Every structure is written in C-alpha cells, then in structure tokens.
Amino acid sequence: MAVTEQDTQVPTLRKIVTSESEPLARRFRALFSLKHLASLQPPTEQTVPAIEAIAAAFSSPSALLKHELAYCLGQSGHDAAIAPLRGVLEDKDEDSMCRHEAAEALGALSDKGSLELLKKMRDDANEVDVVRETCDIAVDRIEWEHGLQKGTEKLKKSDFTSVDPAPPMPESNEAPSIPALEKTLLDTTLPLFQRYRAMFALRDLSSPPDLPTAVPAVHALARGFGDPSALFRHEIAFVFGQLSHPASIPSLTEALSNTKEASMVRHEAAEALGSLGDEEGVEETLKKFLNDPEQVVRDSVIVALDMAEFEKNGEVEYAIVPQAQAIAA
C-alpha cells in the first residue's frame, strides 16, 4: 500500500517539534500544525498521533516550549491529552510555568477525573502560588462546566475560538459596564475564577478593535498589570496577545521592560507584542531583549520576532503548512 502524504504528516511534524537541533521558531510552527490536527472536530485518525507527538516533546529542556505544549493539549478537547498533562502537573521537578499550564489545560478539558488532584494541589500550602492559583481556577471551571449554572447563563458569542480558563461574565438585560467589569477584575477579595470571567468579558468588548468599547476595555485590562498575582498579570498579557490591539502596546512594553517582573509575565508580554509585530516600533522593542538574562524571555523574543515577521508578510496561519513536502523543506 502506498504511503500517502497524510501518513507522513504527523511523524514529520513530531520529528521537528521533538528535535533540539531545530530552531525554536520552527519547532513552534510545527507545534501549531500539530495543534490544528489534534483539535479537528470530529476527531480524525491523526488526532491521537498528533496529541502523542505534542506530548513527546515534554522531554525538551525549554520551559517555553513545554508550557506551549501543555496549552495546545488543553485546546485539543480530547481525553488522550489528560494523562500526559497530569504527569507534568504532578512532577514537582518540572518548571512551575509548565505545571501551571498543565493544570489550566486540565481545566480546559473539563476533566472531572482530575478534580481530586487539582483540589489536592489547590489546598497544599507548600505548593508554589502559580500552581495553587491555577488549580483553584481549574476546579471552578470544571465545576461550572458540569454544573447547572452553565445551562442557565446567557453568554455572549466570542470572536475567539480558544477554550479559556473561565467563561466571560454572563450577559444581562443591561448594556455591559466597563467600570463594573473593571471593578470585578481588580477586586482581590473575589475568587480568581470570577475575576477571570470579568477579564474575558472585557476581552470580548475589545474585539473587533473598532468597537466603541475596545479602547476603554483595553485600558481597563491594562490596569490588571498592577495585580499582586503573577498568574493574573500573565493572563492579562495573554489576552492582549489574542486581541492584538495597538492600545495595549504601552503596557505590554512596560511589562517586558521591567526586569523585576516575573519571567512568566515578561515572556507572555513578549509573545503578545509579537502578535503586534506590524505596528511601528514593536520589532525594535523586542530586539532589545534578545540577550535578556532570563532564558524564557530570550526564547519568547525569538518566537515573537518570528511571529512579527509572519504578521508583516501577511501569512495566513502561524504554522508550518501541513503538507509533507512543505514540512520537510
């Protein structure tokens, strides 16, 4: 039987994403190609091999790559991703940024079977903050997903296809109030899950960028960079990366430039700026951090500059075109 292009697709991408000799930017493009194949609905015969290929790259020393692997597995919507994600979360020797992303991914998969593990880590006083906080949000998300509340809430249709750590605030009969959402966003006495709901509601009011609510909502989100939680600040940067709104550039630049800021926040700010690569001055800003003392920031800048190049070239998808010949080139 002849080997088809489809048969060689996942193995070729797996070889790239797991190879330490491949440039990081190329490995990321291979990863996003695998994410596409892993997330196809309905699943295909490539779904599980693509998930296994993504999980195989957890042996990499790159914290940036591993955290992105976990994110992509969480977006797959497939139970085959659960076991490798639990393995990363339970590995106390793993980078906390990767473990946090694994916990968030289990929440995105709405895996009830992981609730016991997530609750145990949420309640462990010796666990690092970023993992504890993520487990807290993931538990609330899974319980919301499987609870009665979800069915009774009216949610605004989002422009974004991502499976988020929390749904946006439910719609009411009144017009959404940016000051009210900002108040919830910044209230540290509220559960993180509730504050994240305000965050994603503000995100959805920022897109498309010409909405009259967009700039005020972006400015409200930017005030979240003053929060005491590094996890929360990093999620603000992630949302800005999704939005690619020019009004976020000053706060993202400030976050990246602050060498006292947590590396998980700075790296996310760098990647968000990469999505704004066609805006004036952004590439120059990123290039200043190519030799940053923090490896995850350096790596993020490399990927961000590759993304910026992609934005300028008007390429359709930040991925290697999933065709065997193109991949092997």
Swiss-Prot record:
Binding site residues for Fe cation 1: H67, E68, H100, E101
GO molecular function, one term: metal ion binding
EC numbers for this chain: 1.14.99.29
HEAT-like PBS-type repeats: 65-91, 99-124, 232-258, 265-292
Subcellular localization, as worded in the UniProt entry: Cytoplasm; Nucleus
Class of enzymatic activity (EC top level): oxidoreductase
The protein's annotated pathway: Protein modification; eIF5A hypusination
Keywords for the protein's UniProt record, in alphabetical order: Cytoplasm, Hypusine biosynthesis, Iron, Metal-binding, Monooxygenase, Nucleus, Oxidoreductase, Repeat
Main function: Catalyzes the hydroxylation of the N(6)-(4-aminobutyl)-L-lysine intermediate to form hypusine, an essential post-translational modification only found in mature eIF-5A factor.
Protein name per Swiss-Prot or TrEMBL: Deoxyhypusine hydroxylase
Organism for this UniProt entry: Phaeosphaeria nodorum (strain SN15 / ATCC MYA-4574 / FGSC 10173) (Glume blotch fungus)
